[in-house]
């Protein structure tokens, strides 16, 4: 298909509910089930993943804060895709460390929101699969930065003509939000 259907439960279900919902979602063609239960419960996550099998990918990790957390998650067999957020996991260095650990487990990675931030580091990460494109984050990026990455036909393309991430902070536009 041209489009894949993802569901983000944000840890809303119990393990039993998550398995039941996964069966329903699979019938609707869902291919990605993000945080079906709280990612704090790695043993339960691994049980959900085992029960779901190959019907869809189980993704989590956006609340991970360092390489140790990601290693524990992967060692527990809790995810099919390790999702990371550079704003939480020690920046680009932590993101790339997590990606290297995921690669050692044969696990692809994904980035949690902030596409203009994550696209560049994602391109440098082995096994990088996708960036979560969440409307509110994109709206904030547009509002506060020149050079944000617009999506076209479901794809993001890094701007290779600008240095670094290509973002310039809009100081005047941000001033109204200062506290």
Q: Across the structure, where does each feature detected by a protein language model lie?
A:
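Flexible C-terminal active-site loop/helix
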Residues: 110-179
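Catalytic core of soluble alpha/beta enzymes
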Residues: 1-112
